[in-house]
Design a protein with these regions (language model features):
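Specific alpha-helical transmembrane segments that line the substrate/conduction pathway
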Residues: 4-14, 53-86, 213-232
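Specific transmembrane alpha-helical segments of multi-pass solute transporters/efflux pumps
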Residues: 23-62, 67, 105, 193-211
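Loop-to-transmembrane alpha-helix entry segments
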Residues: 27-32, 62-68, 83-105, 125-127, ...
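Juxtamembrane helix-entry segments on the extracytoplasmic side of multipass membrane proteins
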Residues: 1-7, 26-31, 108-135, 172-191, ...
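Hydrophobic/small/kink-forming positions within alpha-helical transmembrane segments
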Residues: 11, 18, 38-42, 46, ...
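Transmembrane alpha-helical segments that form core, pore/gating elements
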Residues: 2, 13-18, 72-79, 114-176, ...
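Hydrophobic transmembrane alpha-helices of multi-pass small-molecule transport proteins
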Residues: 11-12, 17, 36, 41, ...
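Hydrophobic/aromatic residues within transmembrane alpha-helices
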Residues: 5, 51, 81-84, 148, ...
Length: 269
């Protein structure tokens, strides 16, 4: 099941992070950061896992993933809003819209149909609502928690909390452990997924605390592109024209945002 797979991946990932990025003693973390950041981190992961699990078809799973990938756009806009620069949101909006269209093309490809998507949302709205809520929560998390952290990175702690939450959801939903033990390749798949996801979150957490948030927000558009690329390579599927058009739009949207912002900065200097 979806929850079992996610729980296994996050359990292994949490163990890896405990070894590689051992957290500071809990008592040293700011309480507000632990509470607000921890709740948002766990809610995001729980919402996304449940949203994908509640999707009734493969098409709905794709559409739910697209809704989830609104988080880079929301992050760009929120970062602009919290930058306290006059008109920053309006300057970020054109590039954000172009990049979002690019993400939709790159991830959805030729299989994405707006009319079908609207029908699916009406017939099964919960996974779409959860995916959008998750995207919104993650954008808020990335925007507001660095200022609460006092330099502490709670990624490892939050990741382990997600693993516990997913196990609770799995057993409460009436699902038990599998009757048959996974194959060797099953264990390899879990470990590989855990390594990539935990590594990605570790890098993201470090970037939030030590990098430029505006640059990180723009760079986040690469996440769905890289995810789609790796998936198609693993499945041996050729990348079609919509993907490459989408990539061009993502790059163009990001460059437009940078150009408009630099132009505005020159005029105000």
């Amino acid at each position: 099941g979806a929850t079992l797979g996610s729980a296994l991946v996050y359990t292994v990932g949490g163990m890896l992070l405990l070894v590689v990025r051992k957290p500071a003693p809990i008592s040293e973390y700011p309480r507000k950061y632990l509470l607000v950041g921890g709740v948002m981190f766990v809610l995001y992961e729980a919402f996304i896992s449940l949203a994908i699990g509640l999707a009734s078809t493969s098409v709905q799973s794709l559409e739910v993933s697209l809704v989830n990938y609104l988080w880079p756009t929301l992050l760009v806009l929120m970062t602009a809003a919290f930058s306290h620069k006059k008109g920053a949101v309006w300057r970020a909006l054109p590039g954000a819209v172009i990049a979002t269209i690019g993400v939709s093309l790159a991830v959805g490809g030729e299989d994405f149909d707006v009319n079908v998507a609207l029908q699916n949302i009406v017939s099964n709205p919960l996974p779409y609502l959860m995916a959008f809520a998750g995207a919104f929560i993650w954008a808020i998390y990335a925007t507001v928690t660095p200022s609460m952290s006092n330099g502490y990175d709670g990624t490892t702690v939050f990741f382990c909390c997600v693993a516990v939450t997913l196990w609770i959801i799995h057993f409460v939903s009436g699902q038990g452990l599998p009757v048959q033990a996974p194959s060797v390749w099953g264990f390899v798949a879990v470990f590989t997924c855990a390594l990539s996801i935990a590594g990605g979150y570790a890098c993201w957490g470090y970037g939030m605390l030590h990098g430029n948030m505006e640059t990180l927000a723009l760079g986040s558009y690469a996440t769905p592109i890289l995810s789609t690329t790796s998936g198609t390579v693993l499945l041996g599927v050729a990348l079609g024209a919509p993907f490459w058009v989408g990539v061009i739009l993502v790059v163009a949207g990001s460059l437009i945002t940078v150009w408009i912002d630099k132009r505005a900065t020159k005029h105000t200097a």
